[in-house]
A protein has these predicted regions:
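Residue-level recognition of tetratricopeptide repeat
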Residues: 286, 320, 354-357, 391, ...
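Extracytoplasmic and endomembrane cell-envelope/extracellular-matrix remodeling and assembly machinery
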Residues: 31-35, 39-42, 46, 164, ...
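Catalytic Zn2+-binding segment of zinc metalloproteases
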Residues: 109-126, 144
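Terminal, low-structured helical/coil segments at or just beyond the last alpha-helical repeat
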Residues: 395, 406, 412-469
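Residue-level detector of the short coil/turn that links helix A to helix B
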Residues: 292, 326, 360-363, 397, ...
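Canonical tetratricopeptide repeat
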Residues: 283, 317, 351, 388-389, ...
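Helix-start (N-cap) detector for alpha-helical repeat units in TPR-like alpha-solenoids
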Residues: 278, 312-313, 329, 346-347, ...
Length: 469
């Protein structure tokens, strides 16, 4: 009977998660709009944080409180909202140097500092939906035909859809230019990149609206505005400041990585074998991986590791390739090395935890649970980690914990009904008054409980009867 009940729970768990329990790499991530996806990558996020940090500091904002959101989209675009900086892969790939990227970020922070509002209707809709991020460039869930599940894998942040909600007047654009220039100067950065970025797209001004990049529909250009900005930044003391060799190298690595994942065929031509630079070799290794030639990819990753044995992202990449192509036992060691080299990166711990769970060894599954728990101490709203944890607890026969982890997953993807139902089921299987039981109760209370749910909680003393009306 217990076995039968557990089988029923497994079916319910799989249905609730809406996806297979096998993960595969790729960029088939959550769709935002036409040609847009939300993605995660520790290496790129770290580089973007370093680029953005002086800008936020100059604006009086703590960079540690800022979440960098990477959006896979061909067009260049960016937006800032409280606590969030959104950047498209198209912007990164088209920015010639870090200073151009920083210039666009400063312009967006200028809008934020100026209190320039998004289009009210769009922003209202945007603010009502959690922003859901996907797992990463290399490790995404294989979805069982569920677009809704695809939209809810990792973590939530405010202002979902803010890129589509922006719409500024020419006056607001000019003010944001001036504010951005001030921020860049205060940060000790040149405003040249900001002016040059907009000048590079001056031609967009004469295009019919349907032919323009979305960014330049929302941020209308004018020659007068560009010339005013050029005059302003050219007069600033730090105009001659240039990007450091280290910053330029990181920028090229970021672009090469994105090219390898997003444009593998193009990358093989863009970064041909004659180019022996690190970014080119990195791009080719990733491109072979994306073209499903694992042996060629691994050979090139191993060559890179011979030169950079302490690079956690190379070990991460090697582990991803091995995992995707079914070599789980071999994937464990490189993933352990990536975590050892960068222990504060939750996505790397998730990769390791995922592999350990897939090995189906009791000790490995238990260790996988530990790794996922550590990842969740950094990103407690990481829905994919909760989903993996539910699978691990289910494998260990810990039904109460599996149901609680599933409730956490559903809560973080915004499905309050499923979150409440699984939290109620978890309470039935957890020791009363334990921390986990109390957490399940909290989820019930914040997941739109019915009057009957509240009456049941009041009857058992979990809440005061006066709270039930």
């Amino acid at each position: 009977m217990a076995s039968s009940a557990r089988s029923v729970f497994r079916v319910a768990l799989a249905a609730a998660l809406g996806l297979s329990l096998v993960l595969r790499p790729g960029l088939a991530a959550a769709q935002l709009g036409p040609g847009e996806t939300l993605i995660r990558d520790t290496e790129i996020e770290d580089i973007l944080h370093r680029d953005a940090a002086p800008i936020f500091q100059a604006a009086g904002i703590d960079p540690k409180g800022i979440q960098i959101v990477l959006i896979g989209a061909k067009d260049p675009n960016a937006a800032a909202a409280p606590g969030v900086m959104m950047v498209t892969t198209g912007l990164i790939l088209q920015a010639k140097n870090p200073n151009e990227l920083q210039g666009v970020m400063a312009h967006e922070v200028g809008h934020l500092a100026g209190g320039h509002s998004f289009r009210s209707g769009e922003m209202q809709r945007a603010g009502m939906v959690p922003m859901i991020l996907t797992m990463g460039l290399g490790v995404l869930a294989a979805l069982a035909g569920s677009g809704e599940a695809a939209a809810g894998l990792i973590s939530s942040a405010p202002y979902f859809g803010a890129l589509g909600a922006a719409g500024y007047s020419r006056e607001q654009e000019s003010r944001a230019d001036q504010a951005g220039a001030t921020i860049l100067e205060k940060a000790g950065l040149s405003g040249r990149g900001l002016a040059e970025f907009f000048d590079n797209y001056r031609y967009q001004e004469v295009f019919a609206q349907y032919r323009r990049y979305k960014y330049f529909i929302d941020h209308p250009l004018s020659s007068d505005r560009i010339e005013a900005l050029q005059s302003r930044v050219a007069a600033q003391p730090h105009y001659g400041q240039i990007d450091s060799p280290e910053a330029m190298a990181e920028h090229e690595v970021m672009k090469a990585k994105l090219d390898g994942f997003i444009n593998p065929q193009v990358s093989m031509t863009k970064y041909d074998e004659k180019d022996t630079s690190y970014p080119a070799r990195y791009a080719r290794a990733i491109a072979y991986y994306q073209m499903k030639e694992p042996d060629k990819a691994l050979k090139r990753v191993d060559a890179l590791l011979a030169d950079q044995p302490n690079n956690p992202y190379l070990w991460e990449l090697k582990g991803q390739i091995l995992f995707e192509f079914g070599r789980m036992n071999e994937a464990e060691e490189p993933q352990r090395k990536s975590v050892a080299l960068k222990p504060d990166a939750p996505l790397l711990r998730m990769n390791l935890g995922q592999t350990l769970i897939a090995l189906d060894d009791k000790k490995k599954v238990d260790e996988g649970i530990v790794e996922l728990r550590k990842a969740l101490t950094h990103e407690n709203d990481n829905a994919a980690a909760w989903r993996m944890l539910a699978e691990a607890y289910d494998k260990r026969g810990q039904e109460g914990m599996a149901r609680l982890a599933t409730a956490e997953y559903q809560f973080n993807v915004g499905d309050m009904r499923q979150a409440r139902e699984f939290a109620i089921r978890a309470r039935d299987r957890l020791p009363k008054d334990s921390p986990e039981w109390r957490r399940a109760t909290d989820i019930v209370l914040v997941s739109k409980p019915s009057k009957d749910d509240l009456k049941d909680l009041a009857r058992e003393g979990s809440i005061a009867g006066a709270q039930v009306r």
